[in-house]
Amino acid sequence: MSSPKKNFKKPQPKTENQKQALNEERIAELKKSRILGKNRPFKKMIYVDTKAQRKQKHENVAFLKTLQENKESDVPKKRRGRKPKHAPLKEKNNLKLFDILEGSLKSHTENDDTNKVISLLVEVWEKKNKKKDNNSLSNKDIVNVLSKFELPDDEIIFVLDELRDKGIELPHDVEEHIHEFRANQDLSIIDEDIEELTTKNISNRDKVDDNVRFFLGSLDSSKMLDFESEQRIAKVLNSTDEESRKYAINQLVTSNLRLVVSIAKKHLERGLDFNDLIQEGNLGLLKAISKFNWSLGNKFSTYATWWIKQAITRAIADQARTVRIPVHMVETINRLAKAERALNQELGREPTAEELAEKMGGQAEGFTVKKIAEIKRLSLDPVSLDKTVGHDEESQFGDFVRDTDAQMPDEFTESRSNYEKIDELLNNCLSEQEELIVRMRIGMPPYNETKTLDEVSQKIKIPREKIRQIETKAIRKLRQAVRNNHMSLSFMRGNEKKD
């Protein structure tokens, strides 16, 4: 006897409202997982994303693409004219939601650099697949392509997901390898700087001697620490154990020596030798270690960069010039130089003082035409008077500089003759006391400079008022003698010193 057949109900097709409800639930889940929200930090992704999570993310991306296709096919063309006021708001809300999804998808599709990276990696994979029948990309291949572009962390994740969707096998630790490369990407630049400075064909202009080259060669063992290691060592700085503190300081110093060299190289040709710049940068590094607060979560190399730059800049301001210029004025000179270069490129000619003053902020910032001329005069480097000039190098720069204080020969002869006549008048017309006071007040030999009433009073022990009366009487006698002999005492008036 055959068993009765079971009645299986044929599944009914879902209505449009049911489909829309499922879509809204799925979108709510995506929002909760922050797919449509802010991108997660790249670092956290490395240690949180598992294989199952990546699979779920691929499904989410595929779902978003499906929604985008449905939107393009289902949404009817907009009717011309105004929409009736009684039109349902649900359609409007759906359009906004689709616009959000569209923006989320376009954020990746409209990035040219992201598409270039994907195409380059696919080309590398195709070449390897043809030669070795290899269906995978190595960490080195991926890093070599990413190093040519500056992509944010979320774009890198998108690139890796696209490669997996295309069936390309990636190493299991690719995210961690990329993160390590991005954390230490400055090291390659610093290594190139050190290699350039340690080459045998280095020019004398860089002022690198054998001792500095030996120091640069020893930096191969100086490796920058990652963030976790910096935090662990920085905590030891607060230790009460002196040996532990010394160890932590030594680790932070040795791991950042290449950073000091890289910054010092950018300040060459500013008046200090390269070894002096390195030494000042090391002092700034030690200052940064003493001020560093690990609890704020900052990377030490980023924090130390500003202290190193400040130490080098102050050293250049204090030591590079024969006549010291204040640090704030050095910064103003650098600002003016940058403004002048910018205007030169913009206008195609040398900017005027008025244009420079306006570029620097004008009257509101205190920059006038006179102030600009003053700053330019301060920025000039001093030149030695003994510097040789000319092709023969027998002449000196001082030979061509005019001495404004020197007298012409005829002026000197006339002045000497007048002094001899005045000396004779003083001896013949005045008493010893009057002659002494007049000589001190006018500055005649043996007194080579004029003296005030107070100085004369202290010298000869006579009150100021009495000295003034004696001087007035003596000058009256001399004027009478001059009138009688038809002489001139005009040159004496310039030598008198006001009280």
From Swiss-Prot:
Superkingdom assignment = Bacteria
- Residue ranges of region Disordered? 1-25, 68-89
Q: Quick one: which gene encodes this?
A: sigA
- InterPro entries for the chain: RNA_pol_sigma-70_dom (IPR014284), RNA_pol_sigma70 (IPR000943), RNA_pol_sigma70_r2 (IPR007627), RNA_pol_sigma70_r3 (IPR007624), RNA_pol_sigma70_r4 (IPR007630), RNA_pol_sigma_r2 (IPR013325), RNA_pol_sigma_r3/r4-like (IPR013324), RNA_pol_sigma_RpoD_C (IPR012760)
Quote the function comment for this protein. Answer: Sigma factors are initiation factors that promote the attachment of RNA polymerase to specific initiation sites and are then released. This sigma factor is the primary sigma factor during exponential growth.
| Entries under PROSITE patterns matching the protein | SIGMA70_1 (PS00715), SIGMA70_2 (PS00716)
Keyword Cytoplasm carried by entry: yes
Q: Which organism is it from?
A: Mycoplasma pneumoniae (strain ATCC 29342 / M129 / Subtype 1) (Mycoplasmoides pneumoniae)
Query: Could you tell me the keywords of this UniProt record?
Result: Cytoplasm, DNA-binding, Sigma factor, Transcription, Transcription regulation
Q: Where does this chain carry the motif Interaction with polymerase core subunit RpoC? A: 276-279
- Keyword Transcription regulation listed? The answer is yes
Q: Which residue windows does the record flag with biased composition (Basic residues)?
A: 1-12, 77-87
The feature table lists the DNA-binding region at 453-472
Q: What is this protein called?
A: RNA polymerase sigma factor SigA
A biological process (GO) annotation for this entry? DNA-templated transcription initiation
Q: So what family is this one in? A: Belongs to the sigma-70 factor family. RpoD/SigA subfamily.
Main location as per UniProt:
cytoplasm
Molecular function per GO: DNA binding; sigma factor activity
Under the subunit heading, UniProt states: Interacts transiently with the RNA polymerase catalytic core.
